């Protein structure tokens, strides 16, 4: 009798353990971040982790792809071998989306891309592929609006009084959809508002503050240094690097970024940065987790959420931030 009771207890424990393991596996989501030390992706990673805790019952297998697509490809293979029920992928190279989809598709695993848009063709190639991100055109237009607003309100910004903005532009990663589109539309929006522009320098800072500082330092050491009136940056990380360079040269120039990083907001409050565009990491993080969790459980991607899908894409809106509305965003 005693032996039977012991065996029953062991069997119950094994069954309970199996059920717990099964539950964990059912909610196991593999995540790859293109590189952990990117300013904005560091925020995104924290928001994803925070939302997973709020939702509950999720085990995140988080990976740093170290800005190498080959590493990310290997990470996806390992995640699939560990039995993840969904993938959340921040691509290193958007052109690699078909490779990731091929891996996920062979195991019938849903994949939610985020931050780097794989493009409609890639999403359309697999019925369980989704994208959470923004409309980069919107960020360029809003940044252009911010610059135009301050340019028109402050005639002193026109250093040579020619009615034209002489600008330099720090571009993100070449080929990255956000970098290409922000660069195009910020200038188009300025021109559409009747402001003439003249590009003095443009170069990639690869989203990186240190690289951006070096670029701006070179520009401020050139023969055109005194002609620069505005510094435009595809993200706040590079804007912070630009600010360091201007300080080193004893110059104060209007600098505009994108992301609304906490440190950028503080610098706007001090008058050291002119403006930024909120890239909403909180809502993007929530959408990534909520879609991935639903898909991992075999549910509709947006079931029980506020997100709207169009062609299996969720777009989170941008918001312009300057000294006039800064109080709405400072925590």
Curated annotation (Swiss-Prot):
Transmembrane segments: none annotated. The keyword Signal applies. It holds the Pfam family Peripla_BP_4. Its main location: periplasm. Residues 1-24 form the signal peptide. Beta-D-glucose binds at residues 38, 115, 176, 178, 182, 235, 259, 279. Beta-D-galactose binds at residues 38, 115, 176, 178, 182, 235, 259, 279. Keywords: Calcium, Metal-binding, Periplasm, Signal, Sugar transport, Transport. The keyword Isomerase does not apply. Ca(2+) binds at residues 158, 160, 162, 164, 166, 229. InterPro entries: Bact_Solute-Bind_Prot2, MglB-like_PBP1, Peripla_BP_I, SBP_2_dom. One of its GO terms (molecular function) is carbohydrate binding. Gene3D superfamilies: 3.40.50.2300. It is found in: Periplasm. One of its GO terms (cellular component) is outer membrane-bounded periplasmic space. Part of the ABC transporter complex MglABC involved in galactose/methyl galactoside import. The ABC transporter complex is composed of one ATP-binding protein (MglA), two transmembrane proteins (MglC) and a solute-binding protein (MglB). The calcium-binding site is structurally similar to that of EF-hand proteins, but is in two parts, with the last calcium ligand provided by Glu-229. Belongs to the bacterial solute-binding protein 2 family. This is D-galactose/methyl-galactoside binding periplasmic protein MglB. It comes from Haemophilus influenzae (strain ATCC 51907 / DSM 11121 / KW20 / Rd). The gene is mglB.
